[in-house]
Swiss-Prot record:
The operon is cryptic under classical laboratory conditions, but is functional when constitutively expressed. It is found in: Fimbrium. Induction: Expression is negatively regulated by H-NS and subjected to cAMP receptor protein (CRP)-mediated catabolite repression. This is Uncharacterized fimbrial-like protein SfmF. Its main location: other. GO terms for biological process: cell adhesion; cell adhesion involved in single-species biofilm formation. It holds the Pfam family Fimbrial. Disruption phenotype: Deletion of the operon under classical laboratory conditions does not result in any major effect on E.coli capacity to form biofilms compared with the wild-type strain. InterPro entries: Adhesion_dom_fimbrial, Adhesion_dom_fimbrial_sf, Adhesion_dom_sf, Bact_Fimbrial_Adh_Pro. It comes from Escherichia coli (strain K12). The lineage of its organism: Bacteria, Pseudomonadati, Pseudomonadota, Gammaproteobacteria, Enterobacterales. One of its GO terms (cellular component) is pilus. Part of the sfmACDHF fimbrial operon. Could contribute to adhesion to various surfaces in specific environmental niches. Increases adhesion to eukaryotic T24 bladder epithelial cells in the absence of fim genes. Belongs to the fimbrial protein family.
Length: 171
């Protein structure tokens, strides 16, 4: 009985290989990256950073494009390789995909969070910040700003918070 089952199993393997078709042809995938001696670490005080954007009346955000005051924040990196670094923020995009959406749709409505570079220009999600040079000790501080931005008129009050993730680009 075992020989019969084994023979049937082998027969199935050989017969199915004759019918295998590759309808897509060959697909090439190019993978690339860098291997570095060491990478930056985030200063322990900045690992779970909270940026308090403050309390604002809805009258501050009456029309689409209205913003609140800029709130400065920084990320301190240590142990970086020589050269320069840039930061790239990611997160859930708002209807304006350059802005960070709030965490919960039940929160404040028609408002998003805008990130800005140290020169106060907008830093869109997924876009690298300007580079900053690493000092001789392997440290660098990158300065940013954040603010609320109305996506449309009729902002409704509520909690307005979001999470952003950052990646370090080495140059």
């Amino acid at each position: 009985m075992r020989r019969v089952l084994f023979s049937c199993f082998c027969g199935l393997l050989w017969s199915s290989s004759g019918w295998a078709v590759d309808p897509l042809g060959t697909i090439n995938i190019n993978l690339h990256g860098n291997v570095v001696d060491f990478s930056c670490t985030v200063n322990t005080a900045d690992i779970d950073k909270t940026v308090d954007l403050g309390r604002w009346p809805t009258t501050q955000l009456l029309n689409a494009g209205d913003t609140t005051a800029l709130v400065p924040f920084s990320l301190r990196l240590e142990g970086c390789p020589p050269g320069s670094v840039a930061i790239l923020f990611t997160g859930t995009p708002a209807s304006d995909t350059n802005l960070l959406a709030l965490d919960d749709p039940a929160m404040a409505q028609t408002v998003a969070i805008e990130l800005r570079n140290s020169d106060r220009s907008r830093l869109a999600l997924g876009e690298a910040s300007p580079t900053e040079e690493v000092d001789a000790n392997g440290n660098v501080t990158l300065n940013f700003f954040a603010n609320y931005r109305a996506l449309a008129s009729g902002v409704r009050p509520g909690v307005a918070k979001a999470d952003a993730i950052f990646m370090i680009n080495y140059n």
